[in-house]
Amino acid sequence: MMKFIKFDETLEFLPIKTEGNKKYVVVREGVNAGFPSPAEDFLNDRISLDECYLSKPEATFINRVKGQSMYPEYHENDLLIVRSDYEVQHGDDVVVSINRSAYTLKRYDKIQSKLYAINPNYAHSVNITEEDEVILLGVVDALVRNRKRKK
C-alpha cells in the first residue's frame, strides 16, 4: 500500500534532486564580530553544500516553514533540512504526525512526553500517550534562512 505524507499549513515539502554537478564555494576561516586579525585572513577550504547537508539524500527531506508557531527560532519560508535517520532526543525539533494528523514542526520534550510550539502566542502542546500513533518524519538537522529579499 502506498502511503502519502500530508503536511499541515505550517510546512511545505520540497523535493531533493541529487543528479548533476556539485558546486563548491570557498570557505574563509571564521568571521570576526569584533576587529579582524590580519593573521586570520587566509583561505581554508572548499565545501559543497550538498556534501554538508545532503550527505544521505535517501534519509533527508527539505521542508519550508509556514506559520508562526515556532517563531522566533524559525521564520516564515525558512528551509529545514530534516533527517529521518537521526534518533530523536529531548529538545529536538521534529517533523511529526500524531494519530494520522498532518505533519507539523514541534519541539520534543522527552521528560514530559509531549510536543510543543516554542512561540508563547501558540500555547498548544500535544501530550503523547502509549495509545498514540506517532510517525516521525525526522529531526531538524539544519536551517537555511535567506537574509535578503529575492529580487
Per-region residue spans from a language model:
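Short, positionally conserved secondary-structure boundary motifs
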Residues: 1-64, 69, 142-151
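Short, surface-exposed beta-strand-loop junctions and turns on beta-sheet-rich folds
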Residues: 41, 45, 102, 121-124
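Short, compositionally biased
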Residues: 68-71, 92-114
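Glycine- and charge-enriched low-complexity intrinsically disordered segments
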Residues: 110-151
